[in-house]
């Protein structure tokens, strides 16, 4: 495990400041956290911006590893490179995802001063992209890719395309994941349609939805069936409650189809045998499995690890070619205290049509 660094360059500190959950199940700032060691096949990153995801707010109780680092999405500057890395150099800008609260690697997380990249779930930031935009993308990219895999959809740039116009319903079209999913699916040859509140119709259409439906409308599912001529075969649920599952199932056409949720869904609302269903867990993109409690726990998977590598190669090309844009951002200047406040904002349901990104003072 060698490390290659330029002469007189960065030497990792012994300790750093992170955001964590203590042994009393409280989210706290810890100033005496260990820093990660750099493997030969990764790079060391000084973090400039992080994004807050709903999943970050759920890392409590049985999901928490006391004093492990919180945070998934980050963007920062490479300050050291492993000896096996040849395509990245010190000073390059990168963005990526972390497997937060992982008991195997408690020192790795996004809500910190420094981190090391994980697997191949990271990429270089093009010159045209800001820190904040880059930091907002990783979780959405990873979750979208896993959902498309379960739906049986090819990734962008694949030679395989639908042979005819094929609709896919995105329930929760104004969420940050939906923003990424609609772009990926359109680039793969599908035609997204979406549900959201009326105030966010323009946002969903900007992100690629051909048509948008108000989820509060009692006739929402029937209107979707009418619009798709009873041929809808794919639904991605970004909200996951009884209403969302029921609407997706009712909207899918007479021939049936596939429903994928971003969390375990209420199975009693999944009422049609002609519809196959599944749900995805974003952190599995690393192929490392999960030690979270049932039903979230799973074994490591080489297949998923390889898929994650392929997905992030696609994502890297998309951002380099300026074909992937970010969700509307609420940018906050500061540090980990502002990240903690952002988590409370998300946890309290005070965010709609935006994603919180904290820009660190470095």
Swiss-Prot record:
SUPFAM superfamilies: GroES-like (SSF50129), NAD(P)-binding Rossmann-fold domains (SSF51735)
Short name of any one Pfam family annotated for the protein: ADH_zinc_N
Keywords: NADP, Nucleotide-binding, Oxidoreductase, Transferase
Protein name: Compactin nonaketide synthase, enoyl reductase component
Similarity remark: Belongs to the zinc-containing alcohol dehydrogenase family.
Binding site for NADP(+): 55-58, 174-177, 197-200, 215, 262-263, 280, 351-352
Function: Dehydrogenase; part of the gene cluster that mediates the biosynthesis of compactin, also known as mevastatin or ML-236B, and which acts as a potent competitive inhibitor of HMG-CoA reductase. Compactin biosynthesis is performed in two stages. The first stage is catalyzed by the nonaketide synthase mlcA, which belongs to type I polyketide synthases and catalyzes the iterative nine-step formation of the polyketide.
Entry's Gene Ontology molecular function annotations: nucleotide binding; oxidoreductase activity, acting on NAD(P)H; transferase activity
CDD domains reported in the protein's UniProt record: enoyl_reductase_like (cd08249)
Matching PANTHER family: HYPOTHETICAL OXIDOREDUCTASE (EUROFUNG), TRANS-ENOYL REDUCTASE STHE
Residue numbers binding substrate: 139-146, 282-286
Superkingdom as given in the UniProt entry: Eukaryota
